[in-house]
Amino acid sequence: MSDFKRSKANNNTEELIEKIVFINRVAKVVKGGRRFSFSAIVVVGDGNGKVGYGLGKANQVPEAIRKGVERARKDMALVSLTDVSIPHQVIGHYGAGRVFLRPASAGTGLIAGGPVRAVLEAAGVSNILTKCLGSHNPHNMVKATIDGLKQLRSAQKIAELRGKNVEEITA
């Protein structure tokens, strides 16, 4: 389901990549039968280090997607990236799901599956190795991936926090 991709202009004329991760049909049982509605997990990113996710719920699929995109745009996080990959390896956690993110050299490509791939493509990561551990629920995988990306720090940021220069940190 994650192969669906659209680019749309934001109010700020900013191009964002929208990826639908999962669409779920849910039913509410009432006296007269079942009432169906839909939920959609959507990931939005600028392809340059900003990424967010949103869950939209509605009676129709397009409306659920629209609500998910709207929520994802409101809740975007800035991710620290290097030229070709991420600065260091990290494990993102959410619930019973864990996602292991490991930097890769140029030319490796995006080695990830399903929801993790959608998040990383929207964030603009092009070379990375990933492994999903624990729960493979799309909700948990998306949130664990974004948690891992939020933990990333560049060498400059770490040096600034420690009050040292970059050469002392990388040596």
Swiss-Prot record:
Pfam families: Ribosomal_S5, Ribosomal_S5_C
GO molecular function annotation: rRNA binding; structural constituent of ribosome
SUPFAM superfamilies: dsRNA-binding domain-like, Ribosomal protein S5 domain 2-like
One GO cellular component term noted in the UniProt record for this chain: small ribosomal subunit
Domain S5 DRBM: 16-79
Keywords annotated in UniProt: Ribonucleoprotein, Ribosomal protein, RNA-binding, rRNA-binding
GO terms classed as biological process: translation
Family per record: Belongs to the universal ribosomal protein uS5 family.
Function: With S4 and S12 plays an important role in translational accuracy.
NCBIfam families xref list: rpsE_bact
PANTHER family (alphabetical): MITOCHONDRIAL RIBOSOMAL PROTEIN S5
Domain notes: The N-terminal domain interacts with the head of the 30S subunit; the C-terminal domain interacts with the body and contacts protein S4. The interaction surface between S4 and S5 is involved in control of translational fidelity.
Complex and partners: Part of the 30S ribosomal subunit. Contacts proteins S4 and S8.
Protein name, per record: Small ribosomal subunit protein uS5
Gene name of this polypeptide: rpsE
